[in-house]
Amino acid sequence: MRAPWFPCLVLATLLSHAVLAGVRTLISYRALALGGDAVTVGLVTGAFALLPLVVALHIGRAVDRGGGVLVVRLGLILTVAAVLVAAASPSAGFLIGASAVLGLGQILHTVACQSLIPLWSPPEKVDDRFGQLTLGVSAGQLVGFPVAGSVATLTNAGATTGEQVATTPALLVMAGLAALAVPLAFWFVPAERIRVSRADASAVRQSTLAILGTRGMKPAVYSSLTVLTGMDLLMAYLPLLGQSMGLGVGAVTMLLTARSVASVVSRAAMPLLLRAVPRRVLLVSATLASGAPMALVPLTTDIVLLTVMMLVVGFFWGLGQPLTMSWVTTVADPHNRAAALSVRLAGNRIGQVVVPLAAGGLAGITGAGAIFHAGGLLLLSSALCTLVSTREPPAEPGRVAPSRHGVHPTDVTSRRTRRRPAGR
């Protein structure tokens, strides 16, 4: 018996992001255990984004032609492989390779899931479904951090202060969790199966510059970039900062979990917030209200105050990602929605390559604390850009702008191969 497509996508997303959250923190500890330093952590973190940056737009084109389901499956399989390589990595070089493959698997899965929502959903449900998908992301992080942290804490019970953290058992547990997501991608019933010929796709294809030239696209990409980069810096460098501040694995895990809990709450409350608060206010606050706490993290060792900061940051970050997804799909040409989402993710990856590498160099000179100051400033600059660019409110997700070619993608049927939805 086949299952409905949307619950399967959300559950697969929950599992894959549980793995992603746990593994990326564990990889930082493993890099240190293999003799690395802040620069090594920066290289490992940057590798996660480098390969996806190269292939992001090609993935979007494949999804726009109807290959979304295959892309989801490939992404989940690569995630399992990457975690197994990380668990067995004998050197920083292998760890960098595992991080790159993990990033590729994640962007395959992410682009496909985000693109299938506007393709297979009624317009009035797009906002809610993006919110539910990102709620799955936050719930996954909420699961991933404590699972990885608990296994690592048990594995390292009795270790002396300053001793390197053993990560192999926790990474193997994460690999098992990743494997649970793979069957879900083969189980659901696609809402529809559409194949678009290369000739049809080429006729309506926009270049990257044309996509970025769409009104509202650049600030949406920048807002998403700063939020996701902030998440990356927090996951990658809080362990390093924690070691220098005397915080153990359990304390760091608790802080990251608090951030995830707050994101779950904000995403669960998003339908109510959208009815009560103007969309522009939510978009601006996503980066404005999170910038100051991010910058202040290195200035205290008080665990209660740090937890409050994580709760504030997590709540507002939880709003930013689904709102920018809806913004991008609304302003994008209908034929190029997956490509536009890929451009958004490519922008995220540019930030994930450049910022961690710069942060690693900065940390090597000034210490890990400066990374959090820089991340906070990026968030505040994004808030200013969003405020200026949304003087006219972003369009509602149900109000899709007409295609520059004058036709909606579902109207181009002459050279498409359509099959009836499976199970009907």
Predicted region positions:
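Juxtamembrane intracellular "pre-TM" segments in multi-pass secondary transporters
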Residues: M1-A3, F188-V221, S403-R418
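Helix-loop boundary and gating motifs at the non-cytosolic
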Residues: R2-A49, K218-P219, S223, V227-L241, ...
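Helix-breaking motifs and short loop linkers at transmembrane-helix boundaries and internal kinks
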Residues: G35, G67, A88-P90, T300-T301
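Cytoplasmic helix-loop-helix junction between adjacent transmembrane helices
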Residues: A100-V137
